[in-house]
């Protein structure tokens, strides 16, 4: 992962951050799903996907988020879109722009079926995982 950061830093000296991420992604071999934040622009996320690893974008009226799993994103948003191979997204609080092969593309956002992710007590599974990790007892 340090290699990726160094590549982005190298290209950032000659172009903007999004283009630096695009150029860096072209040099990376194998499959990846990345979420990149620039400390100079903490209100932006660059999401990049190559190959099979899952990468999702969630959106609602208040925020846009990125995660690799629907259950992780379900606590923060109600709608989700799957990124496709080669997608690069520029995500801000109030906007999402997705590109593939240099062209702007649209991805379909679908409602998350939170019912299938709940326990018999009606609690979202990510909440249960938080309790397990934090050491809370589950009766």
Language-model regions: role of each:
Residues 1-139:
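Conserved short alpha-helical segments that host acidic/polar catalytic motifs at enzyme active sites
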């Amino acid at each position: 992962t340090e290699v990726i950061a160094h590549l982005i830093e190298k290209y950032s000296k000659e172009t903007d951050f999004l283009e630096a991420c695009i150029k860096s992604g072209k040099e990376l071999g194998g499959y990846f799903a990345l979420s990149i934040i620039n400390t100079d622009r903490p209100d932006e996320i660059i999401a990049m996907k190559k190959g099979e690893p899952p990468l999702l974008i969630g959106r609602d009226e208040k925020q846009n988020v990125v995660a690799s799993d629907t259950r992780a994103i379900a606590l923060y948003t109600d709608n989700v879109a799957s990124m496709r191979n080669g997608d690069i997204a520029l995500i801000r609080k109030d906007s999402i722009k997705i590109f593939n092969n240099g062209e702007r593309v649209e991805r379909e956002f679908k409602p998350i079926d939170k019912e299938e992710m709940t326990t018999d007590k009606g609690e979202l599974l990510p909440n249960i995982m938080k309790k397990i990790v934090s050491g809370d007892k589950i009766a």
